[in-house]
Design a protein with these regions (language model features):
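Glycine/aspartate-rich loop-and-adjacent alpha/beta segment that forms the canonical ThDP
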Residues: 180-207
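Acidic, Mg2+-coordinating active-site environments of NTP-dependent enzymes
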Residues: 1-80, 139, 147, 198, ...
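Short amphipathic alpha-helix with an adjacent loop that forms part of the alpha/beta core around
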Residues: 119-120, 159-168
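Hydrophobic "anchor" residues on beta-strands that sit immediately upstream
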Residues: 78-79, 103, 174
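Conserved active-site loop/cleft motifs that coordinate metal ions or position small ligands
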Residues: 173-179
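Glycine-rich phosphate-binding loop signature in dinucleotide/nucleotide-binding domains
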Residues: 48, 98-99, 164-172
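Active-site beta-alpha connecting loops in nucleotide-dependent enzymes
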Residues: 65, 84-154, 182-190
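Residue-level signal for inorganic ion chemistry
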Residues: 37, 41, 83, 104, ...
Length: 213
């Protein structure tokens, strides 16, 4: 059984003991799907005799996999999240469920999936910037449901996202790159696309320059 901010596992077939561990301060475990993964790992760790402190320490040291809800930069209460591996709407739904006050960068080469699958999560989104081959179509599909602009490139979307946060005076927000599309319109693969986005942490001067305008 999974509860908010806690992992609680009932191992019915093995023991009557209810295992419980506090994960509220483990910020690298983002999203319910990662809590579920952690729950499975926790069961195995307890069965081989590891203590809660040892398990929690391992969770806290785990940085996650690249391009999967990867925190690449944090500026105060503004986070920059690389989810380039989310190449379909189903993967992106997990990202949207994991955050609030989202500036969402979306688009690439469409897999002909229905974007309306993501409509239930738009209340978490402040603004959408669409990019790539499918960008114009996505912007039209989202028009009237959320603030949205087609900006073509990932670089433009990044700059527009920073400007939007500044103009809107958002104190806490997430710039989420979760494209829900493949990368093949502009990049070799999702890894190359993710690495391009990850240049954010190497371009702090650009961020400060934009903020100073």
């Amino acid at each position: 059984m999974l509860e908010k901010k806690w992992l609680k596992i009932n191992i019915i077939n093995f023991t009557k003991i209810n295992y419980k561990i506090d994960i509220k301060n483990i910020h690298n475990l983002r999203g319910r799907h990662n809590w579920q993964n952690a729950a499975a790992a926790y069961i195995v760790a307890k069965k081989i005799g590891l203590s809660n402190d040892t398990i929690k320490s391992a969770f806290m040291s785990f940085k996650g996999l690249p391009h999967r809800l990867e925190l690449v930069y944090k500026d105060g209460q503004i986070e920059y999240i690389n989810d380039s591996k989310a190449t379909n709407v189903y993967a992106t739904s997990y990202a949207l469920k994991s955050f609030k006050s989202i500036i969402w960068i979306l688009g690439g080469r469409s897999k002909d999936e229905k974007i309306d699958y993501l409509f239930p999560y738009l209340s978490r989104v402040e603004h959408v910037f669409t990019i790539g081959e499918s960008g114009e179509i996505l912007a039209k599909q989202l028009h009237g449901k959320v603030k949205v602009d087609f900006v073509s490139s990932l670089e433009n979307a990044f700059c527009k996202s920073i400007n939007f946060i500044k103009i809107s005076k958002l104190k806490k927000s997430v710039i989420l790159f979760s494209p829900a599309c493949s990368s093949f319109d502009q990049f070799k693969n999702f890894e190359e696309r993710g690495k391009y986005f990850n240049n954010i942490d190497k371009n702090i001067k650009l961020i400060k320059k934009i903020n100073a305008r």
